[in-house]
Amino acid sequence: MSKEDEVSRIEANVEVIQGYLLSQFKGFELIDREDPPISYTFTVSKSPDERYLLKVSWTQLSDRTNTPEKTKQCLITDDVAGRMKGRSQGEYFWWKKNL
């Protein structure tokens, strides 16, 4: 596995997650931040009082068996947006899925 392949896979999976979050949190601003090799964080916010946070492990994003299609399906199946909304404001939802 080349470094370029890993970077491309991570970017593709991040784009899928961004699209999912923007579709589930209409009217919200999305900010994401990478923290390699640990995690990638996503913050969707409408105001300081309405903010939802998501963390995804770096290994989950880079795993070669984790295609963008699989990521999209798992986001829906795992109801990631609903679970993010179920957290207290300012508390991250750490999304881990079985690959």
Segments and roles (model prediction):
Residues 18-58:
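Amphipathic, interaction-prone secondary-structure segments
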Residues 22-38, 81-99:
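Short glycine-rich, low-complexity/disordered patches
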Residues 48-89:
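Intrinsically disordered, low-complexity regulatory segments enriched in Ser/Thr/Pro
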Residues 1-32, 64-81:
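Negatively charged, low-complexity tracts enriched in Asp/Glu with abundant Ser/Thr
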